[in-house]
From Swiss-Prot:
Biased amino acid composition, Basic and acidic residues: 114-129
Cell compartments where the protein resides: Mitochondrion
Name this polypeptide is given: Large ribosomal subunit protein mL61
Gene Ontology cellular component terms for the protein in this record: mitochondrial large ribosomal subunit
Gene of this entry: mrp49
Matches recorded under InterPro entries: Ribosomal_mS25/mL61 (IPR040049)
Principal location class: mitochondrion
Length: 135
């Protein structure tokens, strides 16, 4: 195998099986990321996150809307948000954090979100909410 083919294969595998290669639940409408291209004032981790981790999340959630705004003023906080039913259900402040911290924190939140919306947990939640009619 040529070295170019091997490098390409490694890159594609990294995207498919990356740390954020997590399929999101169907009720999620949008993933929104806002950061500045200027890496001063705590935007460097967010910038690296978009370049290195976001492709994996996008690959595993192809039909989902991804809104990436890299024109945020440098004095504002870079954020990662998940939107469902036109409401932000998860927001993460990425200011002054390193890539590894951002990636692991978001990975934990996505797994928790995925676990909360699994069919077993939804059925269990409906059982808890149901109260039989009183006679």
């Amino acid at each position: 195998m040529s070295s170019i083919g091997g490098k390409l294969q490694k890159s594609l595998h990294k995207i498919r099986a990356g740390a954020l290669g997590i399929p999101l639940p169907k009720h999620i409408q949008e993933v929104s990321i806002q950061y500045s291209l200027d890496s001063r004032l705590g935007h460097m981790g967010a910038k690296k996150f978009v370049k290195e981790c976001l492709p994996s999340l996008y690959y595993n959630n192809y039909g989902l809307k991804f809104n990436v705004n890299h024109r945020l003023p440098n004095d504002q906080t870079p954020t990662f948000s998940i939107i469902s039913n036109n409401k932000v259900i998860y927001s993460y402040d990425m200011r002054s954090k390193q890539l590894e911290t951002i990636s692991s924190d978001i990975q934990k939140a996505l797994k928790e979100l995925h676990h909360e919306s699994s069919p077993e947990n939804i059925k269990e939640a409906h059982k808890q909410d149901y109260s039989p009619p009183s006679n």
